[in-house]
Structure formats: structure tokens, C-alpha cells
């Protein structure tokens, strides 16, 4: 699922470190999470769409690597992010 420009701006405003932040780990994880949620909903209806499933697995892996990086750099930023995104239950 592609995100519209307005959706991206809203997510970046909420999770970015400053106004024009698009590259911080928090911003990237938030954008990936939104795309993962959309693709998960798509796959619930289209169970045999294996091409999209592979894309989903790649996105989940990329998000996992970014979260691992964030734990090494700043554990408090990591904890804040997963709590705001609701990733761990």
C-alpha cells in the first residue's frame, strides 16, 4: 500500500525529530509500520498474493533492523517509539 503525501507528512510531523526530518530511525520505523499495517489488511483478503507477502516480509525485516539499531544507539528513544506505535504488547 502506497502512502499519500498527506499521510506521510502527518506521520513525519508526529514521529520526526524536527520539521523536515525524514531520515531518523523513528520516522522510518513509523512510515514502515503504517505500510505494514496496510499490506497486512490487503493480505487478509488476498491470501494467495505471494508477491506482496514477500514485500511485507522485507519491510518487517527492515523495520526490525532499524529498531535493533535504535536499541544500540539510544534505548530510551526505542522504548518511547515502540510504546507510541504500540508494537510490543
Curated annotation (Swiss-Prot):
GO terms for molecular function: rRNA binding; structural constituent of ribosome. One of its GO terms (biological process) is translation. The keyword Ribonucleoprotein applies. SMART domains: Ribosomal_S15 (SM01387). It comes from the Bacteria. InterPro entries: Ribosomal_uS15, Ribosomal_uS15_bac-type, uS15_NS1_RNA-bd_sf. It comes from Saccharopolyspora erythraea (strain ATCC 11635 / DSM 40517 / JCM 4748 / NBRC 13426 / NCIMB 8594 / NRRL 2338). HAMAP family: Ribosomal_uS15_B. The keyword Isomerase does not apply. Part of the 30S ribosomal subunit. Forms a bridge to the 50S subunit in the 70S ribosome, contacting the 23S rRNA. This is Small ribosomal subunit protein uS15. Signal peptide: none annotated. Belongs to the universal ribosomal protein uS15 family. Keywords: Ribonucleoprotein, Ribosomal protein, RNA-binding, rRNA-binding.
Amino acid at each position: 500500500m502506497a502512502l499519500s503525501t498527506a499521510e506521510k507528512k502527518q506521520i513525519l510531523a508526529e514521529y520526526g525529530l524536527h520539521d523536515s526530518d525524514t531520515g531518523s530511525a523513528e520516522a522510518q520505523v513509523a512510515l514502515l509500520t503504517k505500510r505494514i499495517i496496510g499490506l497486512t489488511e490487503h493480505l487478509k483478503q488476498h491470501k494467495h498474493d505471494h508477491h506482496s507477502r514477500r514485500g511485507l516480509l522485507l519491510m518487517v525485516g527492515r523495520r526490525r533492523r532499524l529498531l535493533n539499531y535504535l536499541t544500540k544507539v539510544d534505548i530510551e528513544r526505542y522504548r518511547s517509539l515502540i510504546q507510541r506505535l504500540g508494537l510490543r504488547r
